[in-house]
Every structure is written in C-alpha cells, then in structure tokens.
Amino acid sequence: MKKKLLLIISLIILPIVIVFTLNFIVVKKSEDRIIKEDEIDAISDVDAILVLGCKVNPDGSPSMMLSNRLEKGLEIYQKTGIKLLLSGDHGTKDYDEVNAMKDYILSVDINLDDVFLDHAGFSTYDSIYRAKYIFGIKKMFIVTQRYHLYRALYIANSLGIEAYGIEADNIPYKAINTKNEIREVLARDKDFVKTIFKPSSKLLGEEIDIKGSGRLTFDK
C-alpha cells in the first residue's frame, strides 16, 4: 500500500518539478538579455526592432497590452532609426493583428520604408523563426512585456539570433499580468522542447530583405 502511495505521489510531483525546472531554465538563461533603455545606444549593428503581436479588440484596435508594445517600439525607433518588424497573427480575413499594429504605428509621421509586416507570426516561435529565416535578421531588439521576454529571448538565442529584450510595461495591469504569467509557465516549457527540435514555422514563403523597403510587406 505504501509503495502504491509513493508511486502515486511521485507521478503527481514529478511533472510539477519538470514544469517548474524548465521554466526556471528559460528565465535564468534569458534574464541578462533584458536591457534598460539607456543601454540601447551601446549595442550596434542591430537589424530590426521586433514588436510581437497579441490580442486586438473586437473593433480591430490594439488591446492595451499591444498598444504598450507598439508605443515602446515606436519610441525606440524614433531614438535609433532602426527598422520596425511588426509580427502577429493575420491567419484569417476577420482577425488581423498586423494591420492593427501598422495603423497604430502609422498614426505618427514615420518613413514607410522602415516598417515591415510579418503576417504569419502565429506564435512567438513563428515570429522569431521567420525573423531569422524570412527577414534575414541576425541581431535584433525584441519588444514585449517582461513576462513574455524570457521566452522570446530564449527562442531567439536557441535559433542563433543575437537578441536583446526591452520591456513594454508602460502601464500597470497586474490582473492581466498575473493571468498571463500562469499561462506563460506552460508556454515556456512548450517552447523549450520546441527549440530542441527546431521545427520550421507554420508558414514560410519568399525571403524579404530587412535592409530593403517595408512597403513590399503591406497588403493594404
């Protein structure tokens, strides 16, 4: 009876230990790649600022979380002139993160050649994989909330991209942050495993030179 009980306890505890161990690895491997804004100028030859997409509102406008990412990405662009890569889910006609991101960015005076769209950033992994293999990016800044940066940076490092993370936590939203932190633990574990096998993204396509004009990526 005791052996059975120990086995049951082990079967319950072991998966929990694995989940949190992998999460710990992802966080620890990435935390020193998160930089402050006053460190940006010290990093040279950056190919792009990757702004990762997320939920849009029912009316098609960016959610508060996405707006924060876009504001931070725009702020860095205005300081550095480094090209923007806006990557999100545009998998259906009725759901379009990417053009919502573009419209937000283009609400200010900006050179259209400097704004690139990736319509097939269906996941964090897809966005970063395509940044390397479609857009030819070797070195980049990644803009998203801190909880998300650990995973994004871990994926980038695993794929051989020199990436630095910049937080987009411009406005406090603790309730949203806590909910996403819980989901993120499992997402980190999933992408930890994915980076071992390094599958290609769901959708590839023709290569796009990030040093060229972003207008070629516009569909509207």
Cite the ranges covered by each PLM segment.
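N-terminal type II signal-anchor transmembrane helix
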Residues: 2-40
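Enrichment for repetitive, rod-forming helical segments
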Residues: 9-13, 76, 197
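Acidic/proline-rich low-complexity IDRs
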Residues: 10-13, 83, 203
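A structural signal for short, hydrophobic/glycine-enriched beta-strand patches
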Residues: 25-181
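A general structural signal for short secondary-structure boundary/capping elements
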Residues: 92-97, 164-167, 186-194, 209-215
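A transmembrane-helix-recognition feature enriched in membrane-embedded lipid enzymes
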Residues: 178-204
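Short linear elements at protein peripheries
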Residues: 201-220
